[in-house]
């Protein structure tokens, strides 16, 4: 029997959640996703040293060098993956719609200067109200977006309503919150709060005919991945890709468009309702804030690393 990674690829598009070229080449994913944390890690790799030096020598600010490196690493990844790479807008812009739009267009411009068409890039934006509005504008201009740091059903409904190309609902970080804030410390995969969340979002999208791609993200174990087999896409770390590859057990499809469970009413919220819904969800509020702070911290780490090399 083939390994579980190959079986999973029959049901879901597998995406590599890394900037490590060697790992991407080994596991042969469709796409790859990056974020400030992964870029900071990748920029310190010996193999990327020439890209770092080129970015520093060809730009006149650390901010510009960061953008150049993000795109340069994206270009290297696109030499290997047949699909797309996700490149993230500076998380410090998470509450600024216009600045997010401008940064997204700038990143796409850098890719086009490097000979990469916008069809091979997804712009990552945090799933704040402002980020979702930025995606709505960008999608209408033909720039596809990946809405990340998504923890609530309200966020998912708003992203679909805005016409986002893809969402990245987080699984493991939801599990982390429940383990830290409730008495229950262990969950079977199908009862995992992150798995339950993504399953509901997937079913909602299929029931209402949304084309927005559901890409489960942030996994803590292979059980979560197996419980979401059939999700449109799954972005997976090299460690978990390796564990799936080493396992020759049977993997069955769980999610299908045809069997989307009980009917879920359509949810359309204006800004006030969206903000209230998410404020009522302590897990989503805390994890979104924490996620933005974490990405900002690693963006600053990347900037400081570049300053040390300048």
Swiss-Prot record:
Pfam families: TAL_FSA. It is found in: Cytoplasm. The active site is at 124 (schiff-base intermediate with substrate). Its main location: cytoplasm. GO terms for molecular function: transaldolase activity. Pathway: Carbohydrate degradation; pentose phosphate pathway; D-glyceraldehyde 3-phosphate and beta-D-fructose 6-phosphate from D-ribose 5-phosphate and D-xylulose 5-phosphate (non-oxidative stage): step 2/3. Homodimer. HAMAP family: Transaldolase_1. This is Transaldolase.
